[in-house]
């Protein structure tokens, strides 16, 4: 292929990337989420409720940070744990307080898509399936404050063995920009 045509093909194929970069410039400032803000949201959240703190446009993708509070949960008697799998969003859990058993991976039994108009789809993690997983086919680990677990998109995850509670932050990179950039939890506006 002649050099001028090769250069033209390269420029045409790169133009969408340039347009995207121009429409999503890298932010010029940091975003803070204080411990007091996290505590304020936790005080108003219901047990097992996932609360998005903020969703920030960080240039090439959105980044969301949520806080989740889970109440006591007994060990399953049948070796099966309920689970969720978020199709497009990876999560990083950072355990703040309490402890429990986190189950990840395995094959989802009886998967059902969460309705598209639910808060979990719109504000928290995008399209999600719920179901069950056999603990014997999954990774099972006890987590405590300071532990960090990275859960890739479409990996099911669920909890049991929570003796009192577990509170954890969830960092959620959103490369598809499904979550609403600029969102701030009403409790901390």
Predicted regions and their residues:
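Bacterial N-terminal signal peptides that target proteins for export
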Residues: 1-7
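Bacterial N-terminal signal peptides
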Residues: 7-16
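His/acidic/aromatic-lined binding-pocket segments of jelly-roll/cupin-type domains
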Residues: 83-85, 91-94, 140-141, 148-149
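A short hydrophobic beta-strand segment most commonly corresponding to one strand
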Residues: 164-182
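A short, N-terminal "cap"/entry segment at the start of jelly-roll beta-barrel domains
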Residues: 20-87, 183-189
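Short alpha-helix capping/helix-loop boundary micro-motifs
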Residues: 133-138
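Conserved metal-binding segment of the jelly-roll/cupin
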Residues: 142-163
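Short, conserved beta-strand element in jelly-roll/cupin
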Residues: 87-106, 116-131
């Amino acid at each position: 292929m002649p050099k001028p045509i090769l250069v033209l093909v390269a420029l045409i194929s790169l133009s969408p990337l340039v347009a995207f970069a121009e429409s999503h410039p890298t932010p010029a400032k940091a975003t803070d989420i204080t411990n007091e803000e996290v505590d304020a949201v936790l005080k108003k959240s219901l047990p097992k409720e996932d609360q998005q703190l903020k969703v920030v446009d960080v240039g090439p993708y959105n980044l969301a940070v949520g806080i989740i509070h889970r109440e006591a949960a007994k060990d399953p008697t049948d070796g099966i744990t309920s689970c969720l799998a978020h199709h497009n969003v990876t999560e990083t859990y950072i355990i703040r307080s309490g402890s429990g058993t986190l189950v990840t991976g395995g094959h989802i039994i009886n998967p059902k898509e969460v309705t598209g108009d639910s808060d979990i789809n719109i504000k928290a993690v995008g399209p999600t399936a719920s179901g069950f997983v056999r603990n014997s086919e999954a990774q099972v680990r006890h987590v405590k404050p300071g532990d960090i677990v990275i859960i890739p998109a479409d990996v099911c995850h669920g909890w049991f063995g929570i003796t009192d509670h577990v509170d954890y932050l969830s960092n959620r990179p959103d490369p598809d920009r499904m979550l609403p950039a600029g969102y701030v939890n009403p409790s901390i506006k």
